Amino acid sequence: KRDDGKDDRDENTNKKEFRAKCFDALGALSHIPGEDNSGKINTEKLEEWVQQAINLAEKKGCRNIVEYFIGKLLGHCQNGEDGIWPCEGVRDLVEDIHSKNMIEGMYIEKRNSRGVTSRSFGDGGAQEWRIVEQYQDWSRQLAITHPFVADELLGWLASSYKHEAEMWDDEHRLDMHL
């Protein structure tokens, strides 16, 4: 036992249980805090919720993973009024917080949200090239106002889809030679 009478094993068990409950709760969220039925986000409510979650996570020593789960949740947001994803409130928040963990969560969620794709013979990476162009365009449009989001999130998405497009193009070329 420690000098203060507490048992480290009990404290570690409690921390693990708390973390598991937090991750379950974050993983179970299906709507972004502050989001109404139309998908419009009350930025003040979202910022307050995120700050409270990060502050609590910081106290419990699990900020990185909580930021990641918050990012996964934010990855569900709609396009903004300007047509750019993520919406204005989310991109402002992520730009301010500057968390690579949050970016990673958003990236994973956005990639996973695409689901299964199918293609006709000869398509190659045409689908992915269109996605690359979209993310590159959005990244250019946000480069001045939201450089972190533009580069770290939209640039990463464009790069990963570019890699996938090249893979499908290579596969198509191989099929044509068989």
Kindly give the residue locations of the regions a language model identified:
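Non-catalytic all-alpha helical scaffold/repeat segments
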Residues: 1-113
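TPR-repeat structural position
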Residues: 63, 147-148
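Short, charge/polar-rich alpha-helical segments
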Residues: 116-126
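Short amphipathic alpha-helical heptad-repeat segments
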Residues: 124-136
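Extended, low-complexity, charged alpha-helical tracts
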Residues: 135-145
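Short, charged, amphipathic alpha-helical segments
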Residues: 150-159
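Short, charge-rich amphipathic alpha-helical segments embedded
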Residues: 159-175
